[in-house]
A protein has these predicted regions:
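Loop/turn-rich, solvent-exposed surfaces of beta-rich toroidal or solenoidal domains
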Residues: 293-300, 308-342
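Extracytoplasmic beta-rich repeat domains
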Residues: 37-73, 100-116, 137-153, 176-199, ...
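Structural signature of WD-repeat beta-propellers
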Residues: 83-84, 123-124, 161-162, 205-207, ...
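Short loop/turn segments that connect beta-strands within beta-propeller blades
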Residues: 92-95, 132-135, 170-173, 215-217, ...
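Blade-level signature of beta-propeller repeat domains, shared across WD40, Kelch, NHL, RCC1
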Residues: 356-387
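C-terminal motif of bacterial Sec signal peptides marking the signal peptidase cleavage site
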Residues: 30-33
């Protein structure tokens, strides 16, 4: 009975609670630039494009600016978003209208988890807060910071904290149910990580591993390494799994920061393949290919069967790309100037380019049904319907 209940569950700053330092992507990029001793490369110039796929804009909405690692919460034709000022909103994907909107009046560090009814965020004061129908349901103090959106499923709220603990709370009352503490590392990435459900297993990214947990008690069912820490310093050894994954049935594919892309059979808990890849953003995919953006702006496609490279394009080099997302015939990436680039899934050729509000698209774009939703750093929300 309980198993069915969970089925489909479908700048360095020192932390106060552990001897773990938090490092942002910007910090890593600055350190890399300093070590290379060279100037930052100039972004590739954008060439004129003849639109080969249509992507009409459906609606827009607006939030306050967003500087934390927002992970949109998608469920049941809704998308839940949040902004720096503590605003949390659930939008109807079809119309862009507010289902509800409220303010927690406190800055947010992680969010938004949503099952379409309950939304959950973590504040900079290390509080887990749940919201339902635009009203605060409960809040609980956490012992550590969190940068990954809470995961809401099966009547529970799960939190991956910066000390690499996984915590489960009762969705109605906020009562803590269990904590699973895994071995810590000297550094943790200040970026959204990986949490999802595959069948009756909670799958979490812990350091360079995908780990399967029993959602009822937190016990470990399996671990599959996507990357092993290497290098001469803690920054080079940082291999946290980053948010933005691809899942097809029991197969889950993810990126290890600066290290690799790999796929795991989460039903059996075994590694299928892993390939070196030097990127910092999440991935996307379809039934044939896994798509990623590398640190230098190259966009790559790997075969999902074995990880071998299918194609790569350098037309967007050094444009500070977002994670990709598959939308219609295209794989779509955003850049630091608010452009959306539509590339062919077959060969990476340019199919279209759209603009938003001119601010960076560093938040992973989302697809809900046939609707592509893009959120910018200045708080603009744009919905398109690509062919």
């Amino acid at each position: 009975m309980m198993k069915r209940y969970f089925q489909g569950f479908k700048a360095l700053v020192q932390t106060k609670t552990a001897s773990t330092a938090i490092v942002s992507i910007a910090c890593v990029m600055v350190l890399a630039a300093c070590s290379s001793g060279s100037k930052r490369p100039q972004p590739a110039e954008l060439t004129a494009v003849t639109p080969l796929v249509a992507a009409p804009q459906l609606w827009t909405s607006r939030l306050a600016p967003i500087t934390f690692a927002l992970q949109p919460g998608v469920a049941n034709n809704t998308i839940a978003l949040a902004s720096d000022d503590g605003s949390v909103v659930m939008l109807d994907v079809l119309t862009g209208r507010d289902v509800w909107r409220m303010s927690l009046a406190t800055p947010i560090s992680a969010g938004v988890g949503s099952d379409g009814v309950t939304a959950a965020v973590v504040t900079k004061a290390n509080e887990l807060v749940t919201v339902r129908n635009g009203r605060e349901l409960w809040r609980q103090r956490l012992v550590s910071q969190a940068f990954t959106a809470p995961f809401v499923a099966g009547g529970r709220v799960f939190v991956l904290a910066a000390d690499r603990s996984v915590n489960a709370f009762d969705g109605e009352t906020g009562r803590k149910l269990w904590t699973q503490q895994r071995p810590n590392e000297p550094l943790v990435l200040k970026q959204g990580g990986v949490m999802l459900a595959v069948g009756d297993t909670l799958v979490v990214g812990l350091a360079g591993r995908l780990t399967g947990l029993n959602p009822l008690n937190g016990s470990v069912r399996w671990e599959a390494p996507l990357a092993t820490p290497r290098g001469i310093n803690d920054v080079e050894r940082l291999v946290d799994l980053v948010g933005g994954i691809y899942r097809e049935s029991d197969v889950v594919c993810a990126r290890a920061f600066q290290a690799s892309i790999g796929c795991v059979n989460a039903g059996r808990g075994n590694l299928l393949w892993t390939k070196p890849a030097n990127g910092v953003q999440g991935i996307s995919g379809d039934s044939r290919l896994i798509f990623g953006t590398e640190s230098d702006g190259n966009v790559i496609a790997l075969k999902i069967a074995d990880g071998e490279k299918s194609w790569t394009t350098d037309r967007l080099r050094y444009r500070s790309l977002s994670a990709p997302v598959v939308a219609g015939r295209s794989v779509v990436v955003g850049d630091s100037l608010g452009n959306l680039h539509f590339l062919s899934r077959d060969d990476g050729s340019l199919l279209n380019r759209l603009t938003t509000d001119g601010s960076a698209i560093s938040i992973n774009p989302a697809v809900v049904g046939k609707t592509l939703i893009v959120v910018t750093r200045s708080g603009g929300v744009f919905a398109f319907q690509p062919e």
